[in-house]
Amino acid sequence: MNQAIEAVAGAQEAPHVAAGQSADAEALRAAFQRQRQAYLSDPIPDLAQRRKDLLTLKRLLSENVDQVIAAICEDYGNRSRHETLFAEIITVTDGINDTVRHLKKWMKPQRRHVDRTLYPGARNRLIPQPLGVTGLIIPWNFPVNLAFSQLTGAFAAGNRAMVKLSENSMALAALLKELSPSYFPPEKLAWFEETGGVGIEFSKIPFDLLVFTGSGQTGRAVMAAAAHNLTPVVLELGGKSPAIIDPEYPLKKAVERILFVKQFNAGQICTNVDYAFVHESQRDEFIGQARQYVARHCPDINNADYTSIIDDRSYRRLEETLDDARGKGATVINLSGDQPGNRDQRKFPLHLVLDTTANMTIRSRETFGPILCIQKVADEEEAIRLANDSEFGLNGNVWTRDKSRGYQLATAIDT
């Protein structure tokens, strides 16, 4: 998807389908026009219709759980069934239930302050209304979670949606395209896979709102394409995520919680911890606790519960990241001991990287895998300074029992 959309950055053409454009572009435009006309015919669905749409969305997922899990596993090569159930199924259905419970309240008009100097005697109301047709560009790492949670918001607000999945989610895209017509008409919900040109054309469509989740580089291209139509764009981009561990906090607990998420989905989570700042007196203990955690919880990466890296390119990127760090003086520790990575199955062991420097790739690029930098620090001030030494801040974690101090540290992290 990244390579396909990258070409959009310089596009200046109006978003119409010329004679030489692909069938993909024509299909996208036809789907958009169908949804646009349906929206104009019924612009503000009532509470009953929105609840029906949300519960239908829930049925689409809950009635096809095994097929969805199998499709995601096929796309990954191997995806832990337990991880898919938790991250893609349970959380989504719970979110839909919560939205249904609160929807009536959220739809109510809201009062706002009126400047009586400019508008003497006036009253006002803010009335929530649908935008129209929304476009959702979904990444491969949690495709159901991100697609269905965004659809939950779109349908709750009374919108229609076109969803484009990643080129790494082809099996899931095929399944959802097959299942969806039994639950929603195409003028309400339409799915598209990435075939090499869809991303370009999708970003050109004059949606009422376009939501993109992915890399900053691709996000710039998406925004540039959408700008021609003045399409509002919401970007959820990647970045670096530090963790600061208070020396007074139980180190074993911090290690277990950080590594649980680091190995979840093989670390392919945008908000995952990239590097942990540990007091210099505790670094060796951190390493020891990390070894014990892996020995207990994921001793064999070839187990079906250990998720694969999504594709060969990503696997090579992780290898190159470690090679770059080693070549520039870092110490790399394979927490699986003598068990190397499995290239055929794209199983990558958890690694710790020590003594990193600013010129290493791992310090300037989102890791997006089971690699964790450990940086020893003398105090919290040094931890904050190093944590903020990046323009790519996305998320931050503070492990402490002192809530007041934790809040101060969290607000000091530039994310």
Model-derived segments and spans:
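Hydrophobic packing residues within well-ordered alpha-helices of enzyme cores
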Residues: 72, 173-176, 202, 222, ...
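N-terminal Rossmann-like NAD(P)+-binding subdomain of aldehyde/semialdehyde dehydrogenases
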Residues: 2-124
